[in-house]
Amino acid sequence: MRSSLVGSEMCIRDSYPQFGGPTTASTFDALSDELQGQRWLPDLRFVSSYHDHPAYIKAIADSIREHWESHGRADKLVLSYHGMPKRYLLEGDPYHCQCIKTSRLVADELGLSEDDYMSTFQSRFGRDEWLKPYTDETLQGLPEAGVKSLQIICPGFSADCLETIEEIGMENRDYFIEAGGERYEYIPCLNATANHIDSVSYTHLRAHETRTHR
């Protein structure tokens, strides 16, 4: 990137649907550092989040529907997001609110009631209080509450990684089964599906249209 830039416009969209200071903002900071020293810059447009974009919501909902078609529905759908210290929320970071909105919109798209789904937060570490409810503790308590089968998805990840495959797909499955659960299914991330590619295209298109119609 430091060699040269071509074109009149540049649209930057990272792979984090929900905006977070430690993720999205730090990505934009790193990009700004890379742009320093350029002799010329195109018009820049940052897509700060797409947590509520209809194409993204539909892509998540469709992946859940496809799983239901093959495996049937479970007692509970859990939408688990990467956690962060609660102090970020108290300082005004919109991440938590955007995660909750994503879950609500996906549930609306699927026609779910509030009892059918829940949002949780994973991967905490250290001594600080993190966003709640915690995924691991929640899954350990669900069987006692009568939930014997669940399906879990991570809408905050564009593609599967060690965190989703091992922590959510394996470790948390053990927590649920050992606590008395009977059926645990991890629904993969969007990865390279056609719906995901379409949602990327639509968010870029909206960013361009927003700029040209200002």
List PLM regions with ranges.
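Extended amphipathic ligand-handling, pore-lining, and cofactor/metal-binding catalytic surfaces
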Residues: 8, 13-206
